[in-house]
Amino acid sequence: MRALALLLLLPATVLAQDPLGTLLGAGVRLRPEYDGSSREELQPIPIVRYYGRVLFARTTQGILEGGARSEVLRGLNLGVQLAFEEGNDRTGLDPGASLGLHAEWDTKVGPAPLSVLFRTRHHLDSDRGNQADLRATVGVYGGHGAFVAVFGQATWASDEWVRSYYSTGEGGLLFSALGVEGAYDLSSRWVLVWSVHGRWLHGDAASSPITERKTNYFLSTGVAYRF
């Protein structure tokens, strides 16, 4: 928290407006084979960022998701989303999808843009249970074609989700994460995006028989076209 407070003291070069627009592209991500694995893999990832008057699609809030939302108060949006959910080959869990609700508040802390998201995710396969995310992102620099933000997230999971992913255990706080993400204008139309974060497992996920590391790191980069 002290580091975050220092970042918020950056001068007025911090962005007050959305600099990114609509993005579509592709990249790669270095991640553990599953959350808690000691082995890493490189996987292709989409880069999506679209906000219409009602519909949206994005990969900028931790998962690939799309849906509809509406601004009910200034800066406060409520909506519904369909999201892609990762599988786990170690426990024979196939990738799937979830349906959920979210509330997102966009405001400022001084000159810095702040976004706070609460999101529920109910897996379409009822045996996989539910998850809930609380995520906050704050912009810390914007200038010279670059944008940098820090983010933190906490995710909770039901008993069913923990057992389907880790083979045993009970629900509760699943993981917490802290990271940095950014974008850089390669040209007026092309944007380089990147992200790095650490993820810490908690509860029965951390003590699962298949958990080899309680802390994992994720790195991603890619190029997107700005419409």
Residue ranges of model-derived segments:
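Membrane-embedded beta-strands of outer-membrane beta-barrel proteins
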Residues: 24, 46-48, 66, 101-103, ...
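Short glycine/proline- and aromatic-enriched beta-strand/turn motifs that initiate or cap beta-hairpins
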Residues: 16-64
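Cleavable N-terminal export/targeting peptides
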Residues: 1-21
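Surface-exposed strand-loop-strand hairpins of Gram-negative outer-membrane beta-barrel proteins
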Residues: 32-44, 88-95, 171, 204-209
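Outer-membrane beta-barrel transmembrane domain signature
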Residues: 54, 63, 105-109, 121-214, ...
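Residues that define the transmembrane beta-barrel architecture of outer-membrane proteins
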Residues: 20, 40-46, 74, 93-99, ...
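Residue-level detector of the transmembrane beta-barrel scaffold of outer-membrane proteins
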Residues: 21-25, 56-58, 75-81, 113-117, ...
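Mid-chain, structured segments of secreted extracytoplasmic proteins
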Residues: 60-92, 216
